[in-house]
């Protein structure tokens, strides 16, 4: 449990790289990058794993990256959403239980669960299992009305908000997530894309 959020709190923020339609059809892969930071000030490391586009391995790859890393002083796992590589959905409870670390999801747009369910029904034989993972995710709360939403497992909304403020240098997105996005997109396309 996090009692006080220190300016140098150790966090890892994960985001995925871009992928093409052909990689979806061929069940290709995309990279998942985690940037380990002390607050918003110092990058101390980078983690990476390859995940299957529209697969079911994102949760296991995240667990593996965190548990088997040399960074044993991590306090929080940050995610930029719960779907990676298309519909490779992260089970937030499992990630929390198997790593022992609180999970903080940061998103800019409120997801449309009905549209997600419709897409899952249309494209995936295992749509029920995938949708159940989405449905079990904790409720969203607005940090900045209409602009920034959070989901948490193992953190109070107040502590989560404080962690976001502590780890954000510029803009709305915490620095570990912003950098993870840039690195992952550069690996996949040869150049970083804007957050």
From Swiss-Prot:
Top-level taxon: Archaea
Record-linked InterPro entries: Endo_dU
Disulfide bonding pattern of the chain: none
Family: Belongs to the UPF0215 family.
Name this polypeptide is given: UPF0215 protein TGAM_0348
